[in-house]
């Protein structure tokens, strides 16, 4: 079962909903609020967690800067950004039988792109 690290920009209701759905998820805001993106990646790597974020910078860090982007990254792109909608979208996404490890995934409503992380 995959483990996830939710970036600070993921709404608290989405993190709480994922926890209620028995998803192993840690929220950056709970453990290290305010840390920079490099530290977020290091934390995800150290704990073996897939990063869940709205921040496109993590794609740039992985593909253009060659930084290790954790065990994997899921870039959330739901149609609506209301916290309740994001919560439902996130829980439905994380409960899919997908191997997130080693991939950069872009999740949109009705579309999921999964690209292997650069070596």
Question: Which residues are covered by each model-predicted region?
Answer:
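Short glycine-/acidic-enriched loop or helix-start segments at secondary-structure transitions
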Residues: 15-16, 37, 61-64, 85, ...
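Short, glycine/charged-enriched secondary-structure capping and boundary segments
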Residues: 18-21, 40-41, 65-68, 89, ...
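Charged phosphate-binding loop/patch that engages nucleotide di/tri-phosphates or the phosphate backbone
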Residues: 97-119
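N-terminal first-folded block
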Residues: 2-49
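Acidic, metal-binding active-site segment of PIN/NYN-like and related structure-specific nucleases
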Residues: 44-62
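Mid-chain, well-packed structural core segment of small domains
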Residues: 59-93
């Amino acid at each position: 079962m995959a483990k996830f690290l939710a970036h600070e920009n993921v709404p608290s209701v989405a993190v709480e909903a994922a926890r209620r759905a028995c998803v192993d998820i840690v929220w950056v805001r709970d453990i290290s609020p305010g840390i920079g993106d490099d530290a977020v990646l290091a934390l995800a790597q150290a704990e073996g967690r897939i990063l869940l974020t709205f921040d496109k910078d993590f794609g740039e860090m992985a593909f253009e800067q060659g930084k290790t982007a954790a065990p994997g990254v899921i870039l959330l792109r739901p149609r609506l950004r209301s916290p309740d909608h994001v919560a439902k979208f996130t829980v439905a996404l994380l409960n899919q039988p997908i191997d997130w490890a080693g991939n950069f995934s872009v999740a949109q409503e009705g579309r999921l792109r999964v690209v292997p992380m650069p070596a």
